[in-house]
Amino acid sequence: MIDDSYLDISDHDSFKSGVPHKTFERLRNEEPIFWTKEKNGRGFWSILRHGDILKVNQNYKVFSSERGIRIEDQTEEEYIARRTFQETDPPAHRNIRSLLNPAFSKQKMDEYENLVRKLASDIINQAIQNTKFEAVDKIAKKLPMMMLGRILGVPEDDLDWLVQKGDALIGNSDPDFSELIIDKEDSEKYRLMPFRSPAGADLFDYAEKIINGSVDISKEGILFQMLNNIKTSEGQPVMSDLEFKNFFCLLVAAGNDTTRYS
């Protein structure tokens, strides 16, 4: 699809050839606060200038995350079933992050340096055994996958499967990643799963196994810390099993994807 500056930004097909930069440039110049009508939805606002985005992000009382953060229309039941700590405002958001921060402190990150260097060296040495190779698959994808496994504390044998499911989860509009395309097929039976995706159901099942102890997680990983420290704080439950499952899906998908392309 050719970007003629007037593409429908609610249509996934508008992004088949990449981000439609000409369309976004025109909108920034002409309609930086833009309402998009949807064929099968209630529509959404786009805030397209950097300064405006900063103001929105800093004003959670007006631009709250508590009623959802997705363009997709959700019922109350769907929202509650798929809610993560991303759909919270201060102080709840801050409280959950404060419980997680020790696992991502500078001291903890410094401890990973030698491990990262060793993993990177091994992965590159293995890749260059071939005269030609796909750098994203053999290096950029593999390193964060291995590190994600160490940080989460999941078995190394499960990593390929977890990354595949994470890709399918956030790629639910891309046939290269997902077996079910969210706006092309009936996804009703997955409406209570993360991203309305069958991969979300698979990751929920895996998270349930972590909770009941049938997946052997490392005591050095953050999942072990979460189950022992985050679910209960001062005798009060902080994170339910459902919230843990949703948070696990978030860690698998976002933790791997954002690191791979950075």
PLM features per residue range, with description:
Residues 155-156, 211-220:
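Proline-centered turn/helix-capping motifs that create local helix->coil transitions or kinks
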Residues 196, 200-205, 209, 219-231:
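Amphipathic alpha-helical interface segments
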Residues 1-136, 145-200, 209:
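Active-site substrate-recognition loop segments, prototypically the cytochrome P450 B′-helix/B-C loop
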Residues 128-132, 216-218, 232-238:
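Short, glycine- and charge-enriched coil/turn segments that flank and shape catalytic ligand pockets
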